[in-house]
Amino acid sequence: MDFEYLPFNLVTFFIFLFFVFLLIYGRRKSKRTXKINLPPGPWKLPILGNLHNMMMGSSPHHIFRDLSRKYGDLMLIKLGEFNTIVASSPRMAKEVLKTHDLSFLNRPIIQATKILCYDNSALVFSQYGDSWRQMRKIFVLELLSTKRVRSFQPIRQDEGSRLVSLIKESVGKSIDLSEKIKLYTTSMVARAAFGKVNDAGVTFLKLVTEAAEVAEGFDPADMFPSYKFLNVFFNSRSNLLKIHGKTDMILEEMIDEHIKSHQMGKKANGENGEEDVIDILLSIKDSGDLGISHWMNNVKALIFDMFSAGTETSSATVEWAMTELMKNPSVMRKAQDEVRQAFKGKKTIDESDLEELKYLKLVVKEVLRLHPFAPLLVPRECREACQIDGYDIPVKTRVFVNVWAIGRDEKYWKDPESFIPERFEDNSLDFTGNNFEYLPFGCGRRICPGMTFGLANVHLVLALLLYHFNWKLPPGVNDIDMAERPGLGASKKHGLVLVPSFYQPSF
């Protein structure tokens, strides 16, 4: 069993067990609770609940899928002190995300997001209420609206050209394509947010990646919040505070730099004279429309949101797309033929022409069916008690929707484990959350606000990689590694190493 990515190894786990049992049985008296009708689920250990199930060596979405086959599409598990339900079918997803959406609009309070996201003031992890509504309005209408995403097109084109040039330097050699893709996304997001790529921005992105890796695990301090000593024992809080201190300093400097620039009359700080995210937020503040208190922390939290969501998700999707295309050469040929036919005679791809690439978009849809970046979506928490299928769901119950399992369920998908983009031809399935068998970005009020921004990056980068290069496996490698990185995400465990050869289009 590989414990590399678990929050504790076997030795510390058993020490942890000893202290928890000692404290629980030494300090707590048994409490009588009214009997309620909870969903079915696997048997639970005293105190620990179903944590033993999470030690099975697989990622949570795999474990939950396997358990739900036995206990049903609405399953109850207990992770430490918290009851958690897992919805694993389109019908149950609809119950949680639409029928009872107002009951499940809150997020669980975990210390990683509380520390890193300025007391959960970022949009993704903030609690439902007036502040969240105002933040969402700013994010959706100002920062990442369709019009605003289009305004970032010159940045995407510029960084896309740099990506192509970078890969051309290594033609005929084995390269870690994953690293090249991440370089594009980090540079793109840095320029969109800060106006430029500099050492501070690169450092910030590394810290965001480090923070994401910490947050992806199950932290014992979050599962047993009553026992503060766990923060000392596992040192997680200390590590998070160190990361936050560094990211906060960088954001403070970037915002101060923009404030001074605005005071001097320069309202757009992008490399090509365009407004960046900080410029936009400062303009909203100056107009008096921000409508939120502690605006500096909210601005920082919004930027942190954008970086954490915009870099990892886009790069992971392109990585999986190239992985699946290498594993399915007939699909690769069809996608490349479409791109090269559509742009025949052009030295490079202009983003405005991507609408012609119908098959490429089917490929991306199929990638997100098999490899949604958030396979359990972002967890929710019940804020108003409700009933689903006759089962009682108490307040504070945590909720996962296993969209990864739903996307691979043979009840709803023919040959679900195969990569077949054509399955999306001539049907109404899209990313907007109206079809509950396909929810890579969630749905409703809590749908991913950066969906349009992320897809714009994915479509352009994938088109560039297919147009300008042919790809093969390195010498001695006969198969593609499909392993996922353990945790709450579903990115590739190992980088995608390929050998590019430059394709010279005929003019």
UniProtKB/Swiss-Prot annotation:
The gene is CYP71D2. Its main location: membrane. PROSITE patterns: CYTOCHROME_P450 (PS00086). This is Cytochrome P450 71D2. It is a multi-pass membrane protein. InterPro entries: CYP450_71D, Cyt_P450, Cyt_P450_CS, Cyt_P450_E_grp-I, Cyt_P450_sf. Heme binds at C448. The chain crosses the membrane at residues 6-26, 447-467. Belongs to the cytochrome P450 family. Its EC number is 1.14.-.-. Keywords: Heme, Iron, Membrane, Metal-binding, Monooxygenase, Oxidoreductase, Transmembrane, Transmembrane helix. One of its GO terms (molecular function) is oxidoreductase activity, acting on paired donors, with incorporation or reduction of molecular oxygen. It comes from Catharanthus roseus. GO terms for cellular component: membrane. Signal peptide: none annotated. SUPFAM superfamilies: Cytochrome P450 (SSF48264). It is found in: Membrane. Pfam families: p450 (PF00067). The keyword Metal-binding applies.
